[in-house]
């Protein structure tokens, strides 16, 4: 994902910054505890499409997955 785009995008719920997952398939909101899917290179920033991070993922200093 383009770094400039990643710098602009925020969590739609908390307005906190997002981090790209290690495998590039999700955008992670550590503050909100949510992971938003990236489908065909397009972030899907809908709360209804997000999943809740597991306790282990929340503790991970990197990203989910």
Swiss-Prot record:
Source organism superkingdom: Bacteria
Gene3D superfamilies for this protein: 2.20.25.10
GO cellular component, one term: cytosol
Pfam families for the chain: Trm112p (PF03966)
Signal peptide annotation: none
Family under the similarity heading: Belongs to the UPF0434 family.
Protein name, as recorded: UPF0434 protein Mmwyl1_2153
Native species: Marinomonas sp. (strain MWYL1)
High-level lineage: Bacteria, Pseudomonadati, Pseudomonadota, Gammaproteobacteria, Oceanospirillales
